[in-house]
Amino acid sequence: MYEANEKRLRFSLNGEERERDFIFFEVRYNHFRDVSESVAHEVRDRYEGRVCECALALPDTYRETGAKTPLVLSFHGAGNTVCAERHAVGGVKYATSLIDSGFAVLDVCGSEPHGLTMGCPEHLFAAFKAYRYAVRHYNLSEQVLVTGASMGGHVAMNFANNFPAIVLSLGLIYPRLNIDGVTVGDHYCIGTWDKTTAKEGKISTHDRIVEIYRFPENEWCEARTVGFNPYRSRSFIGADGKRVVIPPCPVKIWQGLEDKTVDPVMVREFAESIRRAGCYVELHLLDGVGHTITPVMREELAMWFERFV
């Protein structure tokens, strides 16, 4: 196990006057994924070590002994990352209300230096290693609360689905929920797979999906997304032809009705699919709000998570 290069930095976030302390550290995880269908009688698994940078913020109420501080995993979206050199703390940046409410908050760069890993298996493996490091080296709760905005919401949902034993609750802020397109009534909700336009010299989201999910011949391959496509994970089609999604824990979602990046129709359908399963979900739709985190979202997220500590 690789755990090294821990450093502590102090700087301000979000234009705040106050400075905060951040702990940066690195974990090593296995990047290998067996995506072939070979029948050869041989050991196929192997170790491909990669290093992932992580950021942890502790609240003023944190103590090294006594009651454990509740831990939140706050995953960043596709436009952010974690990098000590750049004072980039990923999803921790948007969780200051949680830190001020007594929660520790953790995020990871992702499975590649660019951080745009979009909830693929390696991203979750790296996040789990970071979680284990945090709870082993600090007085933090082993059961966690998980949040994320936009693509970070996609990562958060995937993490909860794959590690249900340690997740108490999900708080999703305008989450990306479908890799492939979904038709709801007469409305088509585009997936990340559909976003083929490249921006600012970068490859398109479509091409990023091909890369990180390792699609063969650059063609759609549903088998490579199983377990990592939130709307289709832990789900089935009911007798009425509607999808039923069974989340591993209670869920609350915040979604702006003027969002042009995440389709509010898709988010509503996701909430309804959870209700069809008889599971608990809350959905707060915000009129006049686009693809941005508002003070209302921050305050309610803290109140939502306080129910579970």
Predicted segment positions?
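N-terminal cap/lid segment of alpha/beta-hydrolase-fold proteins
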Residues: 3-66
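Short substrate-entry loop that stabilizes the transition state in hydrolases
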Residues: 65-66, 77-117
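Alpha/beta-hydrolase active-site loop
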Residues: 118-138
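Alpha/beta-hydrolase fold nucleophile elbow
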Residues: 138-150
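Hydrolase active-site cap/lid region
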Residues: 158-220
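Short beta-strand/loop motif that positions the catalytic acidic residue
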Residues: 247, 253-255, 259
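Conserved alpha/beta-hydrolase "acid-adjacent" motif
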Residues: 260-266
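Histidine-bearing beta->alpha loop at or near hydrolase active sites
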Residues: 283-293
